[in-house]
Amino acid sequence: MIKILADDRIPFVSELFGDFGELILKPGAHIQNRDLLAVNALLTRSITSVDSALLEGTAVEFVGSATAGFDHIDSTWLKKQSIHWAYAPGANATAVAEYVLHCVAYLHKKNLLPRKSATAAIIGVGHVGCVVSDRLRKIGFTVFHNDPPRAQLEKDFISVPLASLANVDLVCLHTPLVKTGNFPTYHLIDNRFLKMLKPGSVLLNAGRGAVIDNNALLQCDHVITCLDVWENESTVNLQLLEKTTIATPHIAGYSKQAKLRATLMIYDAFLKYFHLSDTRRFSELQQLQETMTLNIQDGRNAEDILLTLFDPGRESQRMREALAENPDQFEYLRRHFPLRNEFSAIQLTPTPSALLRKELDDWGFK
């Protein structure tokens, strides 16, 4: 019998993994080495550091992380120990891209970003960056890419140098956090880059907090800042928080569909590793597959609809108020943040006009 220990916040972990052995659920922040001594499979999220301190001397042979990144996993050590591991790359790509669109809609409403002839730079064009690029193009942005490692691997990929991005209207960061090698991203956005950006340009980080030197950003007064990730999370620089136009607690990828996607990806890896058959209970997963109905009123445009679904300005104010009262509330806010529905899961009623339908199609509603 397989013994499985899982983070209790992984959606549908009981329904998917409960048939395969003994399943133990525990908060990810409280998982310790002694919990894993007789455990064969560990299912976790980014809140748990998976390294020698956690796994040394345990029976763990499979690690599944329901996350799009793996900064929290010591993959080198796991490989040396012949511990198989899997994660969920790209599971949250649509959710993050739609978070960016919500921010764009908010910035449009505040006249902080041009609606016509706007330009954007995507720094880090992997799973998420590709989707963000595609979605921005569909609403009229001219998009430039910066991803030197990808350009080195793909001869047809054009990576625009950072120094050529001084005049773009929107800079979106979607790189992993890399501290070594030929293409480090730690503090990639530094004082020099920030000074280069034109006044009024928007810097949006929904990747990794330490890709921006937050102290340099604190001294930067000519750029509009939108941050979902923060250097030294879960501690947030309160001075920087007050300067941001949009501030959220690392929730850009938080959609119901992204969470389910991530769980299913590690579920498939688990089945493959242990040579098991799929027993997923579709009826019990149905609620995350159903559409949400949203009533739209006459005269509304696509941006109004986006901001009805998720308003970054309102959420930013909520975060500021919460952290002003208690600076240690970041993880609480993140843990209890309501999951959004992706646009594909939203049914609009009554049927939009042909003009609004075209506008909604451009923004990604189908």
Swiss-Prot record:
The keyword Ribosomal protein does not apply. Keywords: Cytoplasm, NAD, Oxidoreductase, Pyridoxine biosynthesis. The active site is at R208, E233, H250. GO terms for cellular component: cytosol. It catalyses: 4-phospho-D-erythronate + NAD(+) = (R)-3-hydroxy-2-oxo-4-phosphooxybutanoate + NADH + H(+). Gene3D superfamilies: 3.30.1370.170, NAD(P)-binding Rossmann-like Domain. One of its GO terms (molecular function) is glyoxylate reductase (NADPH) activity. Pfam families: 2-Hacid_dh, 2-Hacid_dh_C, DUF3410. Catalyzes the oxidation of erythronate-4-phosphate to 3-hydroxy-2-oxo-4-phosphonooxybutanoate. Belongs to the D-isomer specific 2-hydroxyacid dehydrogenase family. PdxB subfamily. Homodimer. This is Erythronate-4-phosphate dehydrogenase. The lineage of its organism: Bacteria, Pseudomonadati, Pseudomonadota, Gammaproteobacteria, Legionellales. The gene is pdxB.
